[in-house]
Every structure is written in C-alpha cells, then in structure tokens.
C-alpha cells in the first residue's frame, strides 16, 4: 500500500519540494514550548532527518504550554519524548538526540555532523548567544525565537530583523551581546506584544 502520510504536503510543495523535505537535515535546539511546536510542524511536514537537542526533563508545570508535556511524560527526558513523538508521526524519519546543555564546550559535538538548518528555541541568554554566533560564523542557516513568556496575542508574532525588535527584553540583550561580538543576525521570530 502506498504511504499516504504526506500526500497533502506533496500536493502543496510538489514532488521535488517533498523530496527536499525528506532529504533535509534540521536541528531543533530546545524542546520546550517553542521548540516542541516547531518540531511538531517539521515532523508533520515530512522532514526526513531531525536532530533534537535538550538537557532537561518534563515537569508538571510544563503541561499548560508545551505540546510534548503530558501527565505521562512528567519526569522523562525531553529528547526521548520528542523522538518517540516524531517516530509516531513519521516512522521513516531519521531522529538523533543529543542530551546536553548548549555552551562553547558542547557546540562542537552539536555541529559534528552536517546540518541544513537549525531552529534555535533556547530561552536562556548565554547559550542562545553562543549558538547564534557559532551558526552565524559557520554560515549555517537558522531561525531564532526570542522571548514569549507572558505573551498571549498571537497576532503580534512574526519575523523581524533582530536590530529592529521592540518590547522583548531577551531580544534586546541578545542584540547588544551579539553586536559587541561583531555578529549581525538577520530575521528572528519575536512578539511585539507589551507585557505588564
């Protein structure tokens, strides 16, 4: 029987586009709220090779906002839960997991194998800046999410140049730090919503 799993994606992108997705090597760094939803979309689109990076386990407090967090996953490693979910969606996907905290010492391990694109869903300043700078200097395409805490208006989420973000303290700190290091990042995902 023909695999009908990605027929709708192929109808949208064409056969060649679907083959590009099947051959794509994408890394998702950070498997919490933003990273979990990004991973879900990548898996359901038919991306063929995924590398999942996180150091944490699920806590009960994650359940209200993280797609991978369930009563049954509390206490389990985020990478393991994510791999199981991806393989449940697409059993043909090549899934690698790396259980580590991102820093200058662990980045060589993360980037030891070729990757076509990286999704940066890290929510801590130092690892985020370290990852972004390394990807930038190595010419590896990536998208980076900025702060989403306490933001609820999805109409205010979008792409914007890091140099032009407003109302996001994480983006402000990232911008300042990377500017000092001579790193000019293009577009990032951010929310322009004001929080009280």
Where would I find each of the regions flagged by the language model?
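Conserved N-terminal Rossmann-fold NAD(P)-binding element of oxidoreductases
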Residues: 28-30, 53
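ADP-ribose/adenylate-binding Rossmann-like module
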Residues: 117-165
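Conserved small/polar residues in nucleotide/adenosyl-binding loops
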Residues: 193-195
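A structured beta-alpha segment of the ubiquitous adenosine-cofactor-binding alpha/beta core
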Residues: 75-116, 122-126
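Glycine-rich phosphate-binding loop and adjoining beta1-alpha1-beta2 segment
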Residues: 47, 52-90
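N-terminal charged helix/coil linker that caps or initiates catalytic domains
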Residues: 1-27
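Conserved S-adenosyl-L-methionine
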Residues: 43-49, 137
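Hydrophobic/small residue at the entry helix of a nucleotide-binding pocket
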Residues: 34-35
């Amino acid at each position: 029987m023909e695999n009908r799993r990605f027929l709708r994606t192929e109808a949208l992108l064409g056969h060649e586009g679907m083959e590009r997705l099947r051959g794509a090597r994408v890394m998702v760094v950070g498997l919490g709220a933003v990273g979990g939803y990004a991973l879900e979309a990548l898996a359901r689109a038919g991306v063929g090779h995924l590398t999942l990076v996180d150091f944490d386990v699920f806590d009960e407090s994650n359940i209200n906002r993280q797609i991978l967090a369930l009563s049954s996953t509390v206490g389990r490693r985020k990478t393991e839960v994510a791999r199981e979910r991806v393989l449940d969606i697409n059993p043909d996907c090549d899934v690698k997991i790396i259980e580590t905290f991102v820093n200058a010492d662990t980045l060589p391990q993360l980037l030891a194998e070729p990757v076509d694109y990286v999704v940066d869903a890290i929510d801590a300043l130092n690892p985020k800046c370290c990852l972004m700078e390394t990807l930038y200097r190595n010419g590896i395409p990536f998208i980076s999410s900025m702060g989403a805490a306490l933001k609820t208006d999805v109409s205010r989420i979008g792409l914007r140049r890091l140099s032009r973000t407003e109302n996001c303290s994480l983006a402000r700190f990232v911008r300042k730090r990377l500017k000092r290091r001579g790193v000019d990042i293009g577009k990032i995902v951010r929310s322009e919503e004001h929080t009280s």
